Amino acid sequence: MKKKPQWHKLDNAAKIFPANTDKRDTKVFRFSCELYEQIDPVFLQKALEKTLQKFPYYCSILKRGLFWYYIENTERKPLIHIENRYPCSPLYFPNRKSLLFDVSYYHKRINLEVHHVLSDGSGALLFLRTLVYYYILHKHSEAFLNKEIYLENTTTASEKSTDSFSKYFQKEHTSKQQKIPFAYHIKGEYFEIGQMGVIEGCISVKMLLQLSKQHQATVTEFLVAVWIYSIYEGMSVKEQKKPVVISIPVNLRNYFPSDSTRNFFKVIQIVYRFGEQKEDLETVLCSVKKQFQQKLTKEQLRKGMNALSALEHNITMKLVPLATKDYILRFANWISYQKATSCLSNVGKVKMPQEMIPYIRLFDLFVSTKTTQIATCSFEDNFVISIATALKGDLPKRFFCHLSDMGLEIEITTNIEQEC
């Protein structure tokens, strides 16, 4: 008898992604790991097969139900391949049973692309770290002979597929959320649909930390302030009437214990009004730090998480057919888009076993977007800032030039013509 496939409800954060996936914004993000040697595809395929034993949830397809989308396990097995498409190309096709992730390689880089319905950055990063771990372990088996090397990945497959939003949801009276008016939108000519510009800057972690401390700020606070100020420099006086709003995804695992590799994040909004406040970087940074202190607390995040989950648990909403929900979710996404200027995501420090560090140069990530977004991560002393953009313009140049003017040495790589 044919085994009935397992299925999972989408987590709360994932529910908005299927209805809003399109060619311009594929809802795909990419993590990459650059080694000091050329990638061997034979060992990479073996490493992927071993990794999937730890992450069976990844072998899934997205399907439509009567009331909600859902994830269903599949026997389809992924094959690694040389990179042959633009970054963050579509992975989800409504009429096709396609896997929601892809592994490719190019010279010294291993790429993992994931549709956001499957996982968030923290979950996908654990997958890539595991993949790189097995690749190095098998490729250099002689070097690790008689050595016990572990990656802190002891959770079960069941724990990895847990819906942490449902686990922590508490029904409560939700207070009124801060009203944010429509935000300023970055201007520029669009690249062709399916294309995306990527500009990456690699900086010394030590030097960036030192610069942030000089401004009495965390790295994230400092980068958000410089990004806001760089956006301001491209605004007209009339456009300054609208606020600059930066969305910051927050990893809820840092506040609510969870081993899930599915989505478990909450977005906070950092708002600055140049029409009403001073126009210098230090004032912007002061405002950014204050907002982080106010919004980045367990209580505030819990309230926001419950407010989002409440809609999912609403009886009336549950009974609305999926076709109607799609229209509702598209409208909600449009409102969200109107109220944000850009996004900055910092996934933090990437850790690997000490014995494997000599084989790895850096990790990086970037996200599909209809506008311009920043994503950052660090490995050892390499801090990589990746700017993904659907728009032609000099905003990335202004941002990196500000950092360079402050004394940071930056190694720039890009797939578009952009110089600093």
Language model feature labels by segment:
Residues H107-V117, V271:
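Short acidic, glycine/Ser/Thr-rich loop/turn "cap" segments at secondary-structure junctions
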Residues Y70-I71, F101, Y135, F165:
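Tryptophan-centered motif/residue detector
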Residues M1-A14, S32, R109, L118-L126, ...:
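Non-catalytic, low-complexity flexible loops and terminal extensions
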Residues Y36-L52, E113-R129, V198-S236, I385-A388, ...:
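Acyl activation and transfer enzymes in specialized metabolism, enriched
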Residues I110, V219-T220, K241-V244:
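Alpha-helical scaffolds flanking conserved acidic
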Residues L131, Y135-K139, I231, F292, ...:
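Short, well-ordered alpha-helical segments in soluble proteins
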Residues M1-W68, E75-D102, E233-C420:
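Acyl-thioester-dependent acyl-group transfer interface
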Residues Y69-E72, L151-E152:
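Conserved catalytic core of two-metal-ion nucleotidyltransferases
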